[in-house]
Regions:
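Bacterial N-terminal signal peptides
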Residues: 8-19
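Short, acidic loop-to-helix structural element flanking the phosphoryl-transfer center
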Residues: 116-146, 153-154
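Stable alpha-helical elements in mature extracytoplasmic
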Residues: 59, 63-66, 70, 127-134, ...
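Non-catalytic pre-domain segments flanking phosphatase-related domains
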Residues: 18-91
Length: 235
């Protein structure tokens, strides 16, 4: 009996620190699978860090750098404008003009349609500072600004109100997506809206979006600027 108690006491004393501290005990032999795709949880942690950090390659500095490029081109092009030429700037909205970061975090980087509809209805999305700078620069030179968004037509009033509340005022047009064929791509829709602007007599000198599908297709702007967005993809 004494020997049994001694062994039990030895086991208790030997392993108690590990149990109490919650330290994992790694297996002596471990075979790991091949996982070419990074772990989703780790990627989400990296996205949070990328958004919040302040190094030159982080989210906010990258946004501002792209905005600076856009403003430089805008000033150059306005100076070269011909008499009577109608110049236009085209802007996407989500993650280009307005930030949905709070909602993205709330849904853990997923897309829940009802949540996004409720978020858009609140009209609380703040402006993306760099894009607002471009907008104000354009308006100061008399350049017309057109928004082309993938938001549905049902969100027109809420979207317009949110844009104005965020500081975007005195724009020329707001295009939202109505009923469309299921096979119509974002590029097809947005390039079609740009065609309407060109047909109205404007020269699109600058187009800014966070997705390549905001910029691809014809007619294209004379100069296009892609903003960073590793948070979601719209092909």
């Amino acid at each position: 009996m004494r020997e049994v108690r001694t062994i039990a006491a030895f086991c208790l004393l030997s392993f108690a620190p590990l149990c109490c501290l919650g330290q994992p005990v790694p297996p002596t032999h471990l075979s790991l699978p091949q996982e070419p795709t990074p772990n989703l949880g780790k990627l989400k942690t990296k996205l949070l860090a990328y958004h919040d950090c302040t190094a030159p390659t982080c989210y906010a500095p990258s946004l501002n750098h792209q905005a600076d490029l856009a403003i430089a081109w805008l000033r150059h092009r306005v100076a070269q404008a011909k008499p009577g030429e109608k110049l236009a700037l085209v802007l996407d909205i989500d993650e280009t003009s307005l930030s949905n970061w709070d909602q993205e975090k709330a849904d853990d980087f997923g897309y829940i349609g009802s949540d996004w509809d409720a978020w858009e209805a609140k009209k609380q999305a703040p402006a993306i500072g760099g894009t607002l700078r471009v907008f104000n620069e354009a308006r100061s030179h008399g350049v017309a600004v057109f928004f082309i968004t993938g938001r549905g037509e049902a969100q027109r009033t809420a979207t317009a109100d949110n844009l104005k509340a965020a500081g975007y005022k005195d724009w020329a047009g707001l295009a939202l997506r109505g009923p469309h064929p299921k096979d119509e791509s974002t590029t097809t829709y947005k390039s079609g809206e740009r065609r309407k602007i060109v047909d109205a007599g404007y020269t699109i000198i600058l187009n800014i979006g966070d997705q390549l599908s905001d910029l691809n297709g014809r007619p294209q702007a004379e100069y296009s600027v892609k903003l960073p967005n590793p948070f979601y993809l719209i092909p």
